[in-house]
Amino acid sequence: MSEFTQDTVQKPIDELVTWVKQYDFSLNLPTERLAFLLAIAVLSNERFDEELGEGELHDAFAIVTRLFAESGEASAFRANNAINDLVKQRLLSRFTSEMTEGASIYRLTPLAIGITDYYVRHREFSKLKLSIQLSMVADEMAKAVESAQQGGSVAHWRKNVFGVLKYSVSEIFDRIDLNQRVMDEQQQSVKEQIADLLNKDWRDAINNCEALLSETSATLRELQDTLQAAGDELQTQILDIQECVYGDLELDFIEETLSALQMKLDRITSWGQQSIDLWIGYDRHVHKFIRTAIDMDQNRAFSQRLRQSMNDYFEQPWYLTYADAERLSDLRDETLTLRDEEVTGHVPTEVEYEELQQVNDELAQRIGDMLKVHKEQGAAIDLALVLRDYLASHPRTHHFDLARMVVDQAVRLGYSESDYRAIQPDWTAINDFGAKVQANVIDRY
């Protein structure tokens, strides 16, 4: 909230309501009317006196109407109605003088300037990165800190410190606040796009994921790289100036300004942390959607379509887009856990220097020999039953690693015909501790 708005809020609310009621203020700006008002503002800025004649307003209306083809032709009658509507809403002031021979001239009212200025700034700041704005405010704060450390008369403080803080730093803080609100709108848009993924065809959904990941990653990178560092720097600069004015009653106005800036900085950094958490959540949602896109299709239609696309490649060529991301480090130790809390006695000499990998290899060989019996007899391998029987004779702490070895050895022996029919197996329990496996019966060797 700007300082001007804060001063206004301090007035009694009933007084403001009475003022609005007394002058019958009201706004009704459809998209076409708002575009017309912005066109008038652009033309006014190009004029030295910021005054426009009726002919220029008609030209602006014609430009807007051409872009809104569905609204109808740009007739003089419709243009006059639009002009009169803006005058009635106190967005345009109409003047008639003898010098213009009865023709009216028009100027934007303060209300219209406020509205158009907001939209123009909104468009500018949506393109201006947060990092640039934070760099700008840090430079201005550095000037104020340097002047404060030099010291001087009250006039020096008002000119070189208070002036910079009040009219430069504070203004940039307000711009940052506006940029944050723009990013809030962007965040809401991304949230809606993620929700729409579930309602799209799988091809469209996967294509949208690429754009969403680019947007979320770029935003996260900007927030994380700039907010924390810039926030610490600005906080240090504010504390440096406070140290210079501490205990000096003549510089209370500097203290008040610093307090207002501190509130704005706290709001910016707090918003930044919340936004980082939100964007991390959105980024994870998109990654999760990509990981589960195939599993969500219970009939394995995705796999069928992929195989069909491979078969039809020469008749209907296509491009393959893939992401080559860095592998994430898995901190879980995949090797068997050796527990020695209650180990007593001596280790046999023949295994004292035996490596754990060698133990794993021997264990995998035993599992492979066990499964080969199914292949030799031509019997199918139901991994759920095999795992349940095999794990029952081993400690619970070894179940995960042993199950991985069994599955690894089984898929080396053969495959399941059901996989090629896009049949999805059910989840089946393999121990009494909640572990489950989803695998078709291996019946082809």
UniProtKB/Swiss-Prot annotation:
One of its GO terms (biological process) is cell division. Residues 213-241 are annotated as: Leucine-zipper. Pfam families: KicB (PF03882), MukF_C (PF17193), MukF_M (PF17192). Disulfide bonds: none annotated. One of its GO terms (molecular function) is calcium ion binding. CDD domains: MukF_C, MukF_N. InterPro entries: Chromosome_partition_MukF, MukF_C, MukF_C_sf, MukF_M, MukF_M_sp, MukF_WHTH, WH-like_DNA-bd_sf, WH_DNA-bd_sf. Keywords: Calcium, Cell cycle, Cell division, Chromosome partition, Cytoplasm, DNA condensation. GO terms for cellular component: cytoplasm; nucleoid. It is found in: Cytoplasm, Nucleoid. Involved in chromosome condensation, segregation and cell cycle progression. May participate in facilitating chromosome segregation by condensation DNA from both sides of a centrally located replisome during cell division. Not required for mini-F plasmid partitioning. Probably acts via its interaction with MukB and MukE. Overexpression results in anucleate cells. It has a calcium binding activity. Interacts, and probably forms a ternary complex, with MukE and MukB via its C-terminal region. The complex formation is stimulated by calcium or magnesium. It is required for an interaction between MukE and MukB. Belongs to the MukF family. HAMAP family: MukF. This is Chromosome partition protein MukF. The gene is mukF.
